[in-house]
Amino acid sequence: MGHQESPLTRAAAGGAAYIKRLRKVLSWRELGDGHGNLEAEASPGSVAVITRAAPRRATRSARLPASRPTRLCRQARLGTDHPPARAPRGNRFARKRNSAGQITIQGPAPPHLGARRRDEARGARAAPLLLPPPPAAMETGKENGARRGTKSPERKRRSPVQRVLCEKLRPAAQAMDPAGAEVPGEAFLARRRPDGGGGDVPARPRYSLLAEIGRGSYGVVYEAVAGRSGARVAVKKIRCDAPENVELALAEFWALTSLKRRHQNIVQFEECVLQRNGLAQRMSHGNKNSQLYLRLVETSLKGERILGYAEEPCYLWFVMEYCEGGDLNQYVLSRRPDPATNKSFMLQLTSAIAFLHKNHIVHRDLKPDNILITERSGTPILKVADFGLSKVCAGLAPRGKEGNQDNKNVNVNKYWLSSACGSDFYMAPEVWEGHYTAKADIFALGIIIWAMIERITFIDSETKKELLGTYIKQGTEIVPVGEALLENPKMELHIPQKRRTSMSEGVKQLLKDMLAANPQDRPDAFELETRMDQVTCAA
């Protein structure tokens, strides 16, 4: 994929000519796919796939198996499950599940994922993340007793790593920055002088890591403190030796930096820093004058490692807003049901999705794990996060028309995407087939709101963690709603699922519309925002 050249050809061509050709490739790819996140026109023959595992992403592709493997056993909960589907189970397109609840659908197989590396944890001090101010020459640019009742069904999924104490994190930063390995506490980072003069200047630590708050194959997230202001921030560390990591990082980078205005329900992105050989450089998206940025894009396009080796590790660091309240799962399931809180969360989520769609962004992985909570203002505020699978639709075009990167009249509900990606319990029927639009976000939001109001959950069989998620019961198994609707589009959803749930008629009808099997029957984000303001949660 992309522009292929052998190392010998590259050396012969010379650095300047090579970068010039790479820029041409980048310009061509930018117009169609947004830096390695190619969205081809949907076709029944081949569907690219990115599969997800809670709480963070793992990307894999696999060829279509010859026969459908046996479904994982999922223990059903008596008394609170959805009634069995009325239609027989008919032929289902072939797919495969693994023990983490991931799905693979037909598509080309990319290079094998880089093995996840868990940093050693020793030491007795908080580790400084050494990011100096960039030179001018660099680019800038519980409540207890909350839930009682029957046991939730089990579903194999991954769960977040438990919070690690700050005393154990110093080696993690040392692995990131060799200079930090020898200088504890008041460490320095060598960088070149802005005026181009020789020698090194000391750099005050920009951020100090406090605790690890999340880990996945995509990266590690730390709680950190800004050295100058003392503000708490979240810092995501992504190792650049795996092309899949770089591709997901660039997708998130593009989505968050394309937002020209802030929204209180979207996690705020502060800056991106590329660290290599002990030197840090701020990155700006789309800067074709940055050789390092072009090499990142080349890594994503070619699917081969360009930056980052064992002897000289290379990392991307995303600095973002810190949310101290955990995710939506933790917040909702640790408190008693409250119609006022439910209504507030519904309004906040619809406002966030409308804002994203207005800015031509399809999230594609909405789920409670990716919705964070902050209570700094005294009331819970939701923050939609984790944009690694998101798609910026500016520059795409309807069939038969040329793309226009500057087109401000993009309608995300008319742009067809083809990568079957997301988390299975929240995937719309059309996503399973690999032919969908932004209406898939509306379906995922419907699943989240339904599960939040009724406290419908399943249990991770490995970690025993309870997760919000709506499902359909088929015999002794539980099936994601989108998958069941794909088998039987005429299946009637019983909302509310529990007889004792108090739910207004307005919410019932709104949820049915959001979960319609046909995406054309669902409201778009702007209509949903208007309707959501007019309904009440309790009957």
Swiss-Prot record:
Which SMART domains does the protein's record reference?
S_TKc
- UniProt biased composition (Basic residues): 148-160
PTM comment: the record says:
Autophosphorylated.
Any one GO MF term held by the record is:
ATP binding
Region Disordered, residue ranges: 103-161
What is the first-listed, main subcellular location in coarse terms?
A: nucleus
Keyword Nucleus (UniProt): yes
Keywords (A to Z) from UniProt: ATP-binding, Cytoplasm, Kinase, Nucleotide-binding, Nucleus, Phosphoprotein, Serine/threonine-protein kinase, Transferase
Its Enzyme Commission number?
2.7.11.1
As its record notes, the protein acts as a catalyst of: L-seryl-[protein] + ATP = O-phospho-L-seryl-[protein] + ADP + H(+); L-threonyl-[protein] + ATP = O-phospho-L-threonyl-[protein] + ADP + H(+)
Subcellular localization, per the record?
Nucleus; Nucleus, Nucleolus; Cytoplasm
One annotated Gene Ontology cellular component of this protein: nucleolus
* Record-annotated active site: D365 (proton acceptor)
Q: How does it assemble?
A: Interacts with PDLIM1/CLP-36.
Q: What is this protein called?
A: Serine/threonine-protein kinase 35
| Organism classification | Eukaryota, Metazoa, Chordata, Craniata, Vertebrata
